[in-house]
Amino acid sequence: MRCVPVFIILLLLSPSAPSVDAHPKTKDDVPLASFHDDAKRTLQRLWQNTWCCRDHLRCCG
């Protein structure tokens, strides 16, 4: 039972680890990569605003 909290913490940390692309980006991949970067940035901003607004109403904007 002592391993369960450690396993949960490791499970939560694993998605935040940086990912490495196996294939180098080509000219055709650049628009798709920038789209993914924009989507990721937008989701991160929405996630931060959600947690911020839950804790501190002043920081919502």
Swiss-Prot record:
Residues 23-44 form a propeptide. It is found in: Secreted. The modification Cysteine amide is found at C60. It comes from the Eukaryota. Expressed by the venom duct. Contains 2 disulfide bonds that can be either 'C1-C3, C2-C4' or 'C1-C4, C2-C3', since these disulfide connectivities have been observed for conotoxins with cysteine framework V (for examples, see AC P0DQQ7 and AC P81755). GO terms for molecular function: toxin activity. The cysteine framework is V (CC-CC). Belongs to the conotoxin T superfamily. Has the ability to interact with the G-protein coupled somatostatin type 3 receptor (SSTR3). The ability was measured in competition binding experiments and the constant of inhibition (Ki) has been evaluated to be 3.5 uM. This is Conotoxin LiC32. It comes from Conus lividus.
